[in-house]
Amino acid sequence: MKPHFLRRLKEEVEDSIPPLNETVVEVGLTNLQNTYYKGIYGENRMVLAKFGTNSIKTSQLNNMDVQLRKCCNHLFLLKGVEEELTRDCKTDEDLYNKLLESSGKLMLLDKFIEKFRKENHKMLIFSQFKRMLDIIELYLRMKGISYEKLTGSVKN
């Protein structure tokens, strides 16, 4: 069975590729994200205060960390939040607005996409959460933007 991807170093393939230009942009939470973040943090803080760090399992602290990371990426990553926030959405426009206001990062991505589309550039978007890519996929479909998505999933 032949591999789908061949790994090659830049030096082996192409001389004209410009050097990587990486920029870190700090993105604030939306008001909605801030509310959920404080809720998750406060809930876990009470557990820590009650039982102390010695009796808390590392897995519980890791779970809190993952929940906070999900909250910072997009609220729809949190269990039950998507259903809660979209319950009253009657139109695609309502859903689109809720999708954006649930993530400061997606709001910034929306601005970047508009800018890069005007300049006829392409983008690569990476995420550690497959579900985040699903959310971005929904956003792109709603905007009518063509895309390709690569994940570790295998289809029959």
Regions found by a protein language model. Name each.
Residues 12-33, 54-156:
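Conserved Helicase C-terminal RecA-like lobe
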Residues 43:
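Conserved ANL (AMP-binding/adenylate-forming) active-site segment centered on the GW(Y/F)…HTG consensus within
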Residues 4, 8, 47, 72-78:
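Short secondary-structure junctions and interdomain/linker hinges
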Residues 46-55:
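Short, polar/flexible loop-turn hinges at active-site or ligand-entry regions and domain interfaces
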Residues 1-18, 35, 39-40:
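Non-catalytic, charged helical/coil tracts that couple and regulate nucleotide-powered enzyme cores
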